[in-house]
Amino acid sequence: MVPSSGDAMQVLRLSMVITCSALALACTPSPPQRVEDPFVGNWVTAENATITIRPDTIVQHQPDGESTTLDQAACHGMFRFAHGTKSRQDLAGLVPRQPDLRQKISDILVEQSYPVAEVNCDRGDQTYVLLNDRQVLAIYRDGDIGAIERLARR
C-alpha cells in the first residue's frame, strides 16, 4: 500500500511541527546565574552587636534590641552603598591622621587587594573589608576620626 500524497504532506507537517517545537525548547535561554554577594548575611561583633548586610543597605542591631537601617532617611538624604575592590594601601589610607590605626590596618591586611562594601551616610562612612568567607574588618570613619572592628559571620 502506497500512502497518498495528502497523507505524506500530513506526516511532513507533523514532523516539522515536532522538530520546530523541540528546537524552540532547546533554544530557550536558561536563567542567568545569580552571583552570590559574599557580604550578604549577619555579622557579629565582639560586643555581640550584629550587622545585617543586605544587597542594598545595612541594618545595625545593638545588644539592647535597637536597630538602625542605614538608608536615605536615616542618613539625611546622603546615602550611598557600593561594592568594589580596594588595595591594602588605599584601605590603610582611610585614616591618614591616625598613624597607629593605619599601621594596625596594614598589619591585619596581608593581601594586596580586598573586596569591599562601602556605605556613605551623611558625614560618616563605613568600609567593610572581606578578609575571608567568615570574617570582615569594619573601618568606621566620622570626619577624620576612624575606628576598626572585626566581625564574624553568624
How does the language model describe each region?
Residues 37-42, 55-58, 110-118, 135-137:
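Short, hydrophobic/aromatic-rich segments at coil-to-beta transitions
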Residues 23-26:
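C-terminal motif of bacterial Sec signal peptides marking the signal peptidase cleavage site
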Residues 49-50, 65-132:
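Contiguous, well-ordered beta-strand patches that form the walls/edges
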Residues 131-154:
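Edge beta-strand at a domain terminus
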Residues 3, 45, 62, 121, ...:
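Acidic surface patches and DE-rich sequence motifs
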Residues 28-30:
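Bacterial signal peptide processing site
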Residues 4-16:
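Bacterial N-terminal signal peptides that target proteins for export
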Residues 34, 38-73:
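Short, solvent-exposed loop/hinge segments that bridge or flank secondary-structure elements
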